[in-house]
A protein has these predicted regions:
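Nucleotidyltransferase catalytic core that binds NTPs
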Residues: 1-129
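Hydrophobic residues in well-ordered beta-strands that form the structural core
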Residues: 33, 111, 216, 241-243, ...
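N-terminal Rossmann-like dinucleotide-binding module
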Residues: 128-172, 401
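C-terminal helix-rich "cap/oligomerization" subdomain common to oxidoreductases
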Residues: 134, 183, 190-193, 228, ...
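Beta-loop-alpha module in the N-terminal Rossmann-like domain of NAD(P)-dependent dehydrogenases
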Residues: 176-233
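Rossmann-fold dehydrogenase core element
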Residues: 229-246, 267-271
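Predominantly a Rossmann-like dinucleotide-binding segment in NAD(P)-dependent oxidoreductases
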Residues: 247-319, 326
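Contiguous beta-strand/loop segments that form the cofactor/metal-binding neighborhood of enzyme cores
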Residues: 297, 303-376, 407-417
């Protein structure tokens, strides 16, 4: 009996896939089909997969072509599978020609002609075509444009900014460049807002009432009441309102949270997060987006692991700011301490003070160490009393997390299902703390 094996993601199964499976089956007597796992797709940068692993496996099974279906979960598995299943022929699409020649040491390799004019990528693009506009003056606004090129079905068509003269070249070359938000809203289906946090509520509300989906740099309001009202409005009108905190969508950070919540380090007693930069010179302070202070730029990012691991029901907090008196929103250094019934947390953020940008999560059995810059990590460690027990975890990170954030947003819009990695109670808590930072008379100030 001649055994044949082939692999694929098989997202949005189409006649091109079916033709390839039929040709592979004709090469032998028994066909094994390997369907890629979601984590494996993410690890190799394939982030636009629409369907779940279970759906994709079921679609392949329903064709009746495969004799056996397995899951591809890791790099190098093809060699293991060929040996384990006694494979005679490895078959794959011709667009991979030459890529798998090394497998000829283990079995015959056959490259099959692809069906022209059809692909999962084109189907995803047709289904999810979303015209998106950018709003704001942030120095990193162009990162959204650059990373959107890797997201099927998303097209950045314009930008609304008060500083057209200082736009990055890529933004300045967009079809629509304006200082009129209404002009931008008329041309798009959704907006990404990256502006001064003091402007977020008005801009988000404006966009939602214009019927647009919104991805907004956190927080999207400065009080829980305003934040909850925006989330309720979006839900009632079938619109997506999503926090833009890139770290939440990175694979390494997400897996870290799952391990900690699963008790890998015992009970969490302390979370300490630090985010700082000195990249802004005094001259840069004149540029809008560079003068929001450490809290405006880093606050929600540093608070994210605290709220996701310890919750939002802290019993007390202290906010300390170092910055020009009377301009708390331009504070160059901020430290916030939170006390919970059974834990504590601390965060430091700064645009004028430098410190090690690490994340440390202390537990009763072990601790998690994430080296700088932890907010865009692809690696972390779980460290125990006995160093021999330490574990290291590595995960691919594409586009600093922006890319994963954008694909999650597109999927939420296209499916109508909320799938943000940031829960509503955390969004509300971020609004609360950021509002206290800007407005609370109890903020302590140091020189």
């Amino acid at each position: 009996m001649t055994k044949v094996i082939t692999y694929g993601t098989f997202d949005l199964l189409h006649y091109g896939h079916i033709n390839l499976l039929k040709r592979a089956k004709e090469l032998g007597d028994y066909l094994i089909v390997g369907v890629t796992a979601e984590a494996y797709d993410m690890a190799r940068g394939k982030i636009n997969v629409t369907q779940s692993l279970a759906e994709r496996i079921e679609n392949v099974r329903e064709t009746g072509i495969a004799d056996e279906i397995i899951v591809e979960e890791y790099e190098g598995q093809k060699i293991d599978d060929i040996k384990r299943y006694g494979i005679d022929i490895f078959a794959i699409g011709s667009d991979w020609k030459g890529k798998f020649d090394y497998l000829s040491d283990y079995c015959k390799v056959v490259y099959l002609d692809r069906t022209k004019g059809i692909s999962s990528t084109s189907l995803r693009t047709e289904d999810n075509r979303l015209k998106v506009g950018l709003i704001g003056d942030a120095p990193w606004l162009d990162k959204y444009r650059r990373q959107a090129r890797f997201v099927n079905g998303m097209e950045i068509v314009g930008v609304a900014t008060s500083r057209k003269e200082s736009l990055a070249q890529g933004l300045a070359s967009l079809p629509l460049v304006t200082n009129d938000i209404d002009e931008l809203l008329a041309a798009v289906d959704a907006v990404i807002i990256s502006s001064d946090p003091l402007l977020h509520h008005a801009q988000v509300e404006h966009a939602l009432k214009a019927g647009k989906h919104v991805l907004c740099e956190s927080p999207f309001a400065l009080t829980p009441h305003e934040g909850n009202a925006l989330m309720s409005y979006a839900h009632e009108h079938n619109l997506v309102l999503q926090d833009a905190i890139k770290t939440a969508y990175s694979t390494a950070y997400h897996r870290l949270c799952l391990l900690v919540k699963g008790g890998k380090i015992g009970k969490v007693v302390s979370v300490d997060a630090t985010c700082t930069t000195l990249r802004y010179s005094k001259e840069d302070k004149a540029v809008s987006g560079a003068n929001w202070g450490g809290m405006g730029e880093w606050g929600p990012i540093a608070l994210l692991p605290i709220f996701q691991l310890l919750g939002t029901d802290y019993t007390s907090k202290q906010i300390v700011v170092r910055g020009e008196k009377g301009y708390v929103h331009e504070g160059e250094f901020t430290k916030i301490d939170l006390v919970y019934p059974n834990a504590v947390a601390s965060m430091k953020v700064a645009t004028g003070v430098k410190s090690e940008g690490e994340l440390i999560i202390s537990g009763t059995d072990a601790y998690v160490y994430v080296p700088a810059p932890w907010w865009k990590t692809d690696y972390f460690e779980i460290r125990y009393e006995n160093p021999a027990d330490n574990k290291r975890y590595f995960y691919q990170l594409e586009g600093e997390g922006f890319r994963y954030e954008l694909i999650t947003f597109v999927q939420a819009v296209s499916t109508g299902r909320e799938n943000s990695y940031i829960a509503r109670d955390i969004s509300s808590a971020l609004c609360h703390i950021m509002g206290d930072y800007y407005n609370s008379p109890n903020t302590l100030r140091i020189d």
